[in-house]
């Protein structure tokens, strides 16, 4: 059941609401509404305004006939299709006379009903309602006139067959067809329109069609597609087409949004060519000289054209258009009655309000090809077109307002800055002035007074923290003053004796304070000060008297009660000094301090009731005009502090508390919240110039206008923008800020951002800023929905508080998906001009442009519905004109080929490096290919249509079916790059020798697995033969098992339990002396072998038991030593609790324990926390006593239970464990000694640890309900969970911490420390004790496993009950033959697999020998057929025998066998090997090596080729720089280690933090000539013209990424020829991929260059990649 509670009892719905909640399931199929019951009346009162048209079921008939007809029509409606429904359902329309009422309606048009000859109308026809029904003739209709009725509402709901309807119909002809009338009826039923009579001639009846207010559409915005049901809009479109001749030009019928299919081959170049032609033909409205004086480079002609077009897009030097144009989607219609309505012909929506056109596009897409200088074009635009109409309203201080700013007065102003920076540094203890001790004690007692009073420790703490009084030094003084106050009756003791009790205010407190307050109110300032000085001197206390000139002056604090009003005085009233005289301003109500207003402090002060308002004003003026600086400073320092007012609220973004620190504070002008000025980046010099608003108020206000341009770029090229600006723009021309987010800068004031010319931000920062948008204000309702008040204010993003002049998305293809966080945040920014800058705006397809259009905010195409319907859907239907024309308006594109004569870039060439695998790599690749091919085909078969492109599938499916391809591509680079195959790369890079060793180990493991399967099948077959009485055959199979294990003894490990099974059962067969079993020499040693196998198996368990016991003893010894250190009779924590109660600090202790338990505590829903079980020290004492007793109890029980299990297990223990949990019938019974001990462990664990995981009992209780039986017959090893600190231990720690902080007896603290050490020792003991229990349990389990290992297959006895659940070794008599056939098949498969794997192992072993460098890679063994030396090339069959390549080719060509002649037989052992399983060894690969350039280290073929190529580049052209691109970072790490081995200096870009540093080192350091770049981050936007070589380690499926990578060097500024190097492995998936990409490029050059792998590949193409390569391998 849901945990949500009902908020209110159920209530009965009124009748009107009930009618609204009724509906008909088939109403969309029918043309008439539901008929009403016959019992309803026909008419009543005449003043209704309900619907004026109803639909009846037909002419008047008898009730019986009508009921039968209704039932038959209902059946026909249910069975009819949508087309049949329109023809079969009877049309009935009721038209009412027109009456003026208060409801809104508009006349759309009318249709005519023409009377036939010999037909006439009844009297007063125009005032009566009639029903229009069809007649026998399809072109004629019948009118049934209703009787007169006073109530229009009842008249309109009149029913067929009622007495109020005429029985004779009047024949008419309609100007509307029957279909159109049905549409009107459906619309009327939905309360969208009404039909009324209109006056006309006697032979013609005019019926007016009126649209009602309910028929109008409510839109959220003008481009909204509408939320009304689709059928309503379709019918309205038909009506408007009929009445107003609205026909949608050049737009196809709307279809489902997902129905369009992507066109075959999107020609992106065709779009770019159209854009280019359009711009060449248009005339420029703006032609200016864009060569700004501050711009250093001279713009090329194509760049000038681009900047001029951008200026035109931003309406440079042109007046903005009037904002009164009609929206593109809407048409204005004037109804016959003169009303103006607006109609959307695309949706059928009608509205009343004028649909204003959306804001005109300012900006666009700058899509110049990579390397043509888009950055310079943007800088020229920024310099040329600056904002002129910047509104400074939000940046200027409102007239009559001041910014409240103050520095806490207890901090000297000259030390504020130092303390802001170094609050924690040691400083000399400054002199602190405090009020009299009398005042401090009374304040403490009053403020902290509770039900039980205030203890003296609480008074000490309050005085120390609030007044900064040295309590340690003056404790005796405070005690003496407290005695005096008790004697005077100002304080009384309500509990305890002496100073250990609690205190509260006495009965004389009010009268005393009232008298003093009265005297002060009427006295002069000097007299008051004099009295206060006397009062101070009377106390035996440190005197408090402020100096006249010091900045350290503290104001006098005095507490007063005005009259008998019990108003709380939470803050002390303030005595301030002004000029030469002193004046006291005391608030008579005691609510807040009052003081004169000083203009120099800019602080609001409460109204003063003791001094007149005029006097305050005059004093403030005197203070402001005072010529003496010292007096001004004195007045400022002594003005009432804002923190002493009742409405003072402090909440800063730094998280510091109000009382901490001495930083200056500033108040928001809007929400009046105080914050640290430095934290919100507000400077004191701006007090009289700029207003201050807190971050939340700034974000909620109108954005601040600015001239700044916001540039959003990838992290990799953020610093490149700064470099480009510094290089291309003259110094001091632009102010540039690199914004790194609120995490780095805090909240920057919008006026600071507005002062910049360019603000640069990365997409990563923009993405993170989304988390700081829409944060609720601390003052709002959403901001206070927390149990405790927030410690700090969440910082909103200042980016949304600025109206940017220009927003530029660099490499805008990163936000083409409008759902990504960066795109979502970019859309939230407010800007005038919006620009998308990208050299490849289209990567997957033309649908990518939609994300850019959404950012630009171009209506209506920024709505997905209109983008698809008006642009993309026609494009898919071979009508690209609409899309091309729209894109041409917003995009500028220059291609390199069009401006090649202007940029003068040297040519770029390409080199292909075809490589061949080494034998070890080839073997590894074949293994991977076999697994990946099977995996891929299995996944692809789940997809029915193989013609689908991968881009049409969901992301998860694409990732799944591309995973096998990914593994093969990685295997071509380096075996260690394949995830999950080897250890992580952080350990070390694997050499080829290590790869060979790893492959040998894997192959050995596979051989052992195949051998285990073979032995299992042989043992099973032997059991079947014993069942059938074939004892000789059974004995032979058991002997075959023993022979096989001996035969492979040096190569493979045979399972000892399988050998024991064969030995034991063979010994039993021989002991039974069955006839026909021949003896062998080994029979006499079977018993001894069986004994050795058992002892060897048990020795491992016995060793584990001894080791666990040995590990446990030191911990138990340390526990005994710790227990000896605890001497007291009562527990130390109990003594601490008692002392806390004696000193009346028990409440503090309880609170500290609760806080300790609650911190980092995740409470379970069904469990009560310990902190909720006690309220005072008595409850805490009871809980701890109970829990410690339970802990010691279960600790003792667990130790005793384990002690009992130490002795060797008896037969009874083994049998009980077997029945209980080792081999239970269904569920574990938990009845043996081990299970009972485990339950004790579970209980002990719950006491010792804080464990939230279910124990064993709960787990098995849940498994009882499992119908399929026991899921796992093993007992869980432990309870399995979180070993966190228990609540008992945390309580003890809190008590110990309390005792230390209050300096209780050292004895208690020492015992507490020992107790905590004891807890740690107990936890160690528990873990070791549980491991010891596990080893003891495993020892019993091993004994049972030995017993189970000797059991063989047998038939269930006739009277033996059928086991439930079934047992594997007991079978039914009819299952014997089935098991025999299965085991025979298993034996054949295992034998074949074992031979294959042994052959591979032999092949790898021979390969290891052939790679011995001492032999030069030559195999000296002769070929078994021709006797020639095998040399450097030979073939290995699956059996492991080797032949020369010539003999192998002859065997394959002439002696192939099997189906399709696809196998050969070994010339030595005659074992069959398929052609594809023949392994070829090549110890000398000439294609991969160049003898003149040796490479150090053992690397993969491709890594070695990359390193050799880099070395060759350096030899041919010293100082030439090269970029190395790879899709995977792991491959780059492997290459980096290979470069290190060969002493080649390089740098690598793998982390954003070191990106700029490493890139600069590559560019400017002459010794670093190699840069390793990951493709996904290093290929976008970077300018690295210093490099001339680009190395692509693997073929790239996304050619757009490839173009980006190549474009890093082939761009403006490049002065040298560039070379692209590609590395491909022959006869692998890479060769197939390269051929596929070349084919796609030739068939459609441009479009294939912009697609991702998901767009390039189809399902069939992916399958073809695997199948074709499989054929090549064969």
From Swiss-Prot:
CDD domains listed in its UniProt record: DEXQc_SHPRH, H15, PHD_SHPRH, RING-HC_SHPRH-like, SF2_C_SNF
Region of interest (Disordered), residue spans: 1-26, 524-548
Cellular-component GO terms for this entry: nucleosome; nucleus
Tissue expression summary: Broadly expressed (at protein level).
Basic and acidic residues bias: start-end ranges: 12-26, 526-541
Short motif DEAQ box, span: 810-813
Pathway participation: Protein modification; protein ubiquitination
Coiled-coil ranges per UniProt: none
GO biological process, one term: DNA damage response
Superkingdom classification of source: Eukaryota
Domain Helicase ATP-binding stretches: 302-384, 701-859
PTM annotation (Phosphoserine): residues: 259, 261, 626
Keywords: ATP-binding, DNA damage, DNA repair, Helicase, Hydrolase, Metal-binding, Nucleotide-binding, Phosphoprotein, Transferase, Ubl conjugation pathway, Zinc, Zinc-finger
Comment field on protein domains: The RING finger mediates E3 ubiquitin ligase activity.
PANTHER family: E3 UBIQUITIN-PROTEIN LIGASE SHPRH, E3 UBIQUITIN-PROTEIN LIGASE SHPRH FAMILY MEMBER
Protein name, UniProt field: E3 ubiquitin-protein ligase SHPRH
Gene label: Shprh
């Amino acid at each position: 059941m849901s945990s949500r509670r009902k908020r209110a009892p159920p209530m009965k719905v009124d009748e009107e609401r009930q009618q609204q909640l009724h509906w008909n399931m088939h109403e969309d199929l029918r043309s008439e509404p539901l008929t009403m019951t016959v019992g309803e009346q026909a008419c009543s009162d005449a003043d209704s305004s309900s619907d004026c048209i109803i639909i009846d079921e037909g002419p008047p008939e008898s009730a019986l006939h009508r009921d039968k007809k209704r039932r038959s029509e209902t059946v026909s409606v249910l069975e009819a299709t949508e087309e049949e429904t329109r023809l079969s359902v009877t049309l009935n329309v009721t038209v009412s006379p027109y009456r003026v009422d208060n409801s809104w309606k508009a006349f759309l048009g009318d249709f005519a009903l023409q009377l036939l000859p010999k037909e006439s109308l009844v009297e007063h026809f125009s005032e009566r309602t009639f029903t229009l029904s069809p007649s026998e003739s399809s072109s004629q209709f019948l009118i049934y006139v209703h009787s007169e009725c006073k109530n229009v509402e009842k008249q309109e709901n009149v029913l067929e067959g009622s007495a109020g309807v005429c029985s004779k119909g009047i024949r008419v002809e309609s100007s509307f067809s029957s279909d159109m009338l049905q549409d009107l009826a459906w619309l009327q039923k939905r309360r969208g329109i009404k039909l009324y009579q209109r006056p006309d001639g006697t032979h013609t009846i005019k019926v007016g069609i009126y649209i009602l207010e309910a028929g109008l559409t409510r839109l959220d915005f003008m481009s909204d597609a509408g939320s009304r049901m689709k059928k309503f809009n379709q019918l309205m479109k038909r009506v408007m087409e009929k009445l107003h001749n609205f026909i949608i030009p050049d737009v196809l019928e709307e279809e489902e949004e997902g129905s369009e299919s992507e066109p075959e081959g999107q020609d992106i170049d065709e779009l770019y060519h159209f854009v280019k032609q359009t711009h060449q033909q248009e005339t420029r409205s703006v032609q200016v000289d864009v060569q700004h004086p501050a711009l250093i480079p001279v713009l090329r002609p194509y760049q000038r054209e681009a900047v001029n077009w951008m200026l035109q897009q931003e309406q440079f030097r042109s007046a903005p258009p009037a904002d009164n144009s009609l929206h593109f989607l809407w048409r204005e219609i004037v109804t016959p009655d003169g009303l103006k309505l607006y109609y959307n012909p695309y949706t059928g929506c009608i509205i009343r309000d004028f649909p204003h056109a959306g804001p005109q596009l300012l900006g666009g897409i700058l899509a110049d090809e990579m390397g043509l200088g888009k950055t310079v074009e943007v800088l020229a635009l920024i310099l040329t077109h600056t904002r002129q109409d910047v509104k400074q309203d939000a940046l200027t201080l409102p007239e009559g307002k001041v910014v409240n700013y103050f520095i806490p007065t207890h901090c000297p102003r000259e030390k504020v800055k130092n303390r802001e920076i170094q609050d924690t540094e040691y400083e000399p203890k400054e002199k602190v002035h405090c009020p009299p001790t009398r005042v401090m004690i009374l304040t403490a007692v009053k403020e902290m007074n509770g039900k039980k009073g205030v203890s003296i420790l609480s008074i000490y703490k309050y005085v120390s923290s609030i007044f900064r009084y040295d309590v340690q030094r003056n404790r005796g003084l405070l005690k003496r003053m407290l005695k005096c106050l008790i004697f005077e009756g100002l304080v009384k003791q309500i509990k305890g004796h002496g100073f250990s009790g609690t205190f509260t205010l006495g009965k004389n407190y009010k009268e005393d304070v009232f008298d003093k307050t009265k005297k002060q109110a009427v006295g002069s300032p000097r007299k008051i000060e004099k009295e206060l000085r006397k009062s101070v001197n009377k106390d035996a206390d440190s005197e408090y008297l402020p100096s006249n000139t010091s900045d350290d002056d503290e104001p006098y604090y005095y507490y007063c009660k005005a009259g008998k009003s019990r108003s709380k005085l939470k803050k002390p009233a303030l005595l301030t000094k002004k000029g030469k005289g002193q004046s006291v301003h005391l608030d008579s109500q005691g609510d807040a301090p009052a003081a004169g207003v000083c203009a120099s402090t800019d602080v609001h002060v409460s109204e003063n009731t003791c001094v007149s308002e005029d006097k305050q004003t005059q004093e403030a003026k005197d203070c402001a005009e005072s010529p003496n600086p010292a007096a001004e400073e004195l007045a400022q320092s002594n003005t009432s502090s804002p923190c002493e007012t009742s409405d003072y609220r402090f909440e800063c973004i730094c998280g510091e508390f109000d009382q901490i620190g001495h930083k200056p504070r500033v108040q928001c002008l809007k929400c009046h919240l105080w914050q640290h000025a430095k934290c919100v980046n507000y400077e004191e010099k701006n007090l009289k110039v700029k207003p201050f608003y807190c971050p939340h108020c700034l974000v909620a206000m109108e954005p601040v206008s600015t001239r700044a341009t916001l540039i959003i770029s990838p992290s990799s090229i953020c610093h490149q923008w700064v470099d480009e600006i510094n290089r291309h723009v003259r110094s001091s021309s632009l102010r540039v800020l690199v914004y790194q987010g609120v995490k780095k800068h805090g909240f920057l004031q919008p006026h600071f951002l507005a002062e910049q010319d360019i603000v640069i931000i990365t997409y990563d920062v923009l993405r993170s800023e989304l988390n700081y948008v829409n944060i609720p204000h601390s003052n709002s309702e959403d901001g206070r929905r927390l149990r405790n008040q927030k410690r700090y204010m969440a910082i909103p993003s200042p980016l949304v508080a600025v109206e940017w002049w220009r927003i530029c998305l660099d490499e805008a293809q990163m936000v083409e998906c409008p759902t990504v966080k960066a795109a979502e945040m970019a859309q939230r920014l407010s800007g005038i001009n919006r620009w998308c800058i990208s050299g490849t705006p289209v990567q997957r397809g033309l649908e990518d442009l939609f994300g850019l259009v959404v950012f630009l905010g171009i209506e209506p195409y920024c709505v997905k519905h209109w983008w698809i319907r008006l642009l993309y859907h026609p494009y898919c239907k071979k009508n690209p004109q609409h899309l091309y024309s729209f894109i041409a308006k917003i995009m500028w594109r220059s291609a390199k080929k069009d401006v090649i004569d202007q940029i003068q870039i040297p040519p770029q060439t390409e080199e292909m490096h075809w490589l061949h695998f080494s034998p070890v790599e080839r073997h590894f690749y074949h293994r991977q290919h076999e697994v990946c091919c099977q995996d891929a085909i299995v996944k692809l078969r789940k997809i029915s249509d193989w013609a689908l492109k991968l881009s049409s599938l969901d992301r998860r499916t694409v990732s799944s079916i591309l995973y096998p391809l990914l593994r093969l591509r990685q295997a071509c680079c380096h075996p260690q790059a394949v995830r999950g195959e080897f250890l992580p790369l952080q350990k070390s890079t694997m050499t080829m020798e290590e790869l060979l060793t790893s492959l040998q180990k894997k192959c050995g493991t596979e051989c052992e697995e195949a051998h285990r399967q073979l032995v299992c099948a042989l043992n099973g077959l032997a059991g079947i033969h014993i069942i059938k009485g074939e004892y000789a055959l059974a004995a032979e199979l058991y002997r075959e098992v023993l022979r096989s294990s001996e035969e492979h003894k040096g190569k493979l490990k045979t399972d000892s339990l399988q050998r024991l099974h064969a030995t034991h059962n063979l010994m039993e067969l021989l002991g039974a002396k069955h006839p026909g079993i021949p003896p062998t020499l080994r029979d006499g040693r079977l018993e001894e072998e069986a004994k050795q196998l058992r002892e060897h198996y048990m020795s491992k368990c016995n060793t584990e038991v001894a080791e666990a016991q040995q590990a446990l003893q030191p911990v138990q010894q340390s526990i005994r030593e710790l227990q000896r250190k605890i001497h007291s009779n009562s527990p130390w924590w109990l003594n601490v609790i008692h002392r806390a109660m004696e000193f009346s600090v028990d409440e503090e202790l309880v609170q500290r324990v609760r806080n300790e338990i609650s911190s980092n505590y995740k409470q379970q829903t069904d469990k009560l926390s310990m902190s909720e079980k006690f309220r005072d020290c008595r409850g805490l004492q009871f809980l701890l006593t109970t829990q410690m007793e339970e802990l010691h109890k279960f600790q003792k029980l667990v130790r005793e239970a384990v002690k009992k299990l130490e002795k060797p297990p008896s037969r009874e223990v083994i049998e009980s464990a077997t029945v209980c949990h080792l081999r239970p019938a269904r569920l574990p019974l938990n009845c043996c000694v081990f299970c009972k001990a485990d339950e004790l462990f579970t209980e002990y664990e719950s006491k010792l640890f804080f464990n939230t995981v279910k124990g064993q009992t709960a787990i098995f209780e849940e498994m009882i309900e499992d119908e399929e039986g026991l899921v796992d017959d093993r007992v869980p090893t432990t309870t399995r969970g979180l070993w966190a600190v228990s609540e008992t231990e945390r309580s003890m720690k809190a008590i110990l911490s309390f005792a230390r902080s209050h300096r209780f007896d050292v004895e208690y603290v020492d015992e507490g420390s020992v107790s905590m050490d004891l807890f740690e020792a107990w936890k160690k003991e528990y873990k070791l004790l549980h491991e010891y229990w596990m080893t003891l349990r495993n020892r019993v389990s091993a004994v049972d496993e030995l017993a189970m290992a000797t059991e063989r297959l047998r038939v269930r006895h006739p009277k033996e009950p059928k086991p439930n659940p079934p047992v594997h070794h007991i079978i039914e008599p009819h299952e014997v033959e089935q098991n025999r056939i299965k085991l025979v098949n298993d034996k054949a498969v295992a034998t074949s697999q074992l031979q294959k794997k042994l052959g591979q192992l032999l092949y790898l072993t021979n390969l290891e020998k052939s790679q011995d460098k001492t032999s030069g890679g030559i195999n000296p063994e002769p070929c078994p057929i021709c006797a020639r030396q095998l040399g450097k090339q030979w073939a290995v069959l699956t059996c492991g025998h080797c032949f020369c390549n010539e003999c192998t080719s002859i065997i394959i060509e002439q002696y192939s066998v099997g189906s399709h002649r696809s196998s050969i037989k070994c010339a030595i052992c005659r074992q069959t090997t398929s052609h594809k399983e023949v392994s070829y060894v090549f110890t000398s690969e000439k294609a991969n090596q160049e003898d003149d350039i040796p490479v150090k280290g053992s690397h993969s073929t491709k890594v070695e080729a990359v390193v050799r190529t880099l070395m060759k580049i350096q030899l041919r052209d010293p100082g030439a720089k090269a970029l190395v691109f790879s899709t995977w970072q792991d491959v780059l790490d492997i290459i980096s280690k290979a470069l290190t081995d060969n002493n080649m200096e390089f740098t690598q870009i793998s982390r954003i933090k070191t990106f700029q540093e490493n890139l600069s080192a590559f560019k400017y350091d002459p010794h670093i000539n190699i840069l390793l770049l990951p493709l996904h981050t290093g290929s976008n936007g970077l300018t690295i013209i210093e490099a001339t070589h680009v190395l692509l380690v693997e073929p790239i499926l996304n050619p757009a990424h490839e173009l980006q990578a190549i474009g890093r060097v082939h761009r403006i500024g490049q002065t040298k020829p560039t070379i692209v190097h590609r590395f491909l492995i022959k006869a692998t998936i890479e060769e197939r991929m390269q051929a596929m990409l070349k084919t796609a490029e030739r068939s459609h050059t441009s479009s294939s260059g912009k697609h991702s792998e998901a767009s390039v590949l189809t399902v069939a193409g992916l399958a073809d990649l695997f199948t074709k390569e499989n054929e090549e391998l064969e």
